[in-house]
Regions:
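An amphipathic, aromatic/His-enriched active-site/gating alpha helix that lines ligand/cofactor pockets
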Residues: 26-37, 53-89
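Short, surface-exposed ligand-recognition loops at beta-strand->loop->(often short) alpha-helix junctions
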Residues: 9-22
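Short acidic, gly/pro-rich beta-turn/loop elements at beta-sheet edges
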Residues: 18-20, 60-62, 99
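Glycine-rich beta-strand-turn "strand-cap" elements at beta-sheet edges
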Residues: 1-2, 11, 36-49, 73-101
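Short coil/turn motifs at secondary-structure junctions
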Residues: 13-15, 43, 55-57
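Hydrophobic core residues within well-ordered beta-strands of beta-rich domains
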Residues: 4-6
Length: 101
């Protein structure tokens, strides 16, 4: 079971979505996430989210503290939101709903 989930919402600059996906694919190839799931999903209207499902808080922090972070690779292809931020992110520990059965 996952221990931590992270979601990073973003909007590629016009005409830059394919370049962003290529940069992400090259990053994932060259800097493997090991067995931690990371995928980009299409939210609609030109907005996407990078979802990371981590086994533990420690594995999440290891990704966050990488010297070469995926967000820095993606930033050049991303249109900032109205608040000036390139990404809108949230994360938290998994609530195991089976504990309530």
């Amino acid at each position: 079971m996952a221990g931590m989930i992270n979601c990073m919402r973003f909007r590629p600059k016009e005409g830059q979505a394919e370049a962003l996906f290529k940069a992400f694919a090259e990053y994932a190839r060259d800097n493997p996430f090991d067995d931690i799931m990371h995928h980009i999903i299409n939210l609609s209207d030109g907005e996407y989210a990078l979802i990371g499902v981590h086994h533990s808080v420690e594995s999440f922090m290891a990704i966050v503290n990488r010297e070469n972070r995926v967000s820095e690779i993606m930033r050049e292809y991303v249109e900032p939101y109205e608040d000036g931020e390139a990404f809108h992110s949230f994360s938290g520990p998994v609530v195991n709903h089976n504990d309530y059965l």
